């Protein structure tokens, strides 16, 4: 058996994640306009656009554990190929939908067959040495962030020149390229676990190194995504309330991008720091840091100040999801790592669905500032809970 160079796999998986992140961010910003172009009445555009976006996350949350079970049984590379090829059809096929019902149907299928990023994460986590998992998974996460930042620029340019449907064809091409790169260059010598040594899913949660931490890390993923997405629906409106009336969308986009760029810069650095001082320690510190920044955002007095705070916020996010992923990889047996990452993805998706609804509800009742206060409170509770859970482990670097 030849030794697999996990660093080579990391490079290819990073680029695959970049293409996947770009594909997602290419589609979402244009969804309301595309829904309108399909003939939906103006008063229903927001509803159907929201449905088209959320239905994908909901179906992904429901089916993610199934793909995790299959990945542990047949390998992570086949699941990456399956996701890439299936999403080539479901995302590229959006270019040909004749009405809103076909759009919703394809978005539903897209979520059902999604899973390139979590399987890429599980693949690298299963191959990288435990002591370098923070560095590797932190680096891997920057691929999605970089793609998410790049996507809207490419999409806007293509949409202006050739129309929105051409954007969907481009997305399909990106995902097909990700699948081809996986087929040709990703190396995985997967050895199925013998039946008598296989870990049933029911027993998996008790076979990890620290069973009580597993669900806690799942909940942490939920809170991280919930808090991040709760801001999305109100950010542009908050920027306007802070006095920005001209070029509102452009300025709002810059503020979003500032956080993305700082997150991309910090993820690799935070991953290395987590390997050096302990990912569990760094996770608690990063959550406490997030609470402070959310409170500062709630008291911002200008769009420039808000942008600065969001940039600073991004510097800490490199220790959040990558930190959770590193901890999951360290406490989980390799025979069950795909299932654990799949279940974690369920909580991540649910946070992405519930967060925007909660943020909008709080803003409607108490104003835009209140969303940041409420979000900081949620993260503070999660931070305190993690501190209690990790209290006996904070004395050691590795868990």
Say what each PLM segment does.
Residues 167-183, 372-388:
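Symmetry-related core transmembrane helices of the 12-TM Major Facilitator Superfamily/SLC fold
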Residues 51-67, 257-269:
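Central cavity-lining transmembrane alpha-helices of secondary-active solute carriers
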Residues 30-46, 234-250:
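Short amphipathic helix-loop junctions that connect adjacent transmembrane helices
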Residues 1-7, 188-217, 399:
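Juxtamembrane intracellular "pre-TM" segments in multi-pass secondary transporters
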Residues 62-98, 274-280:
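Conserved MFS/SLC helix-loop-helix module at the cytosolic interface between two early adjacent transmembrane helices
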Residues 182-195, 387-399:
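Helix-loop junctions on the cytosolic side of multi-pass membrane transporters
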Residues 106-144, 327:
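Cytoplasmic helix-loop-helix junction between adjacent transmembrane helices
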Residues 90, 101-109, 293, 304-312:
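Paired small-residue
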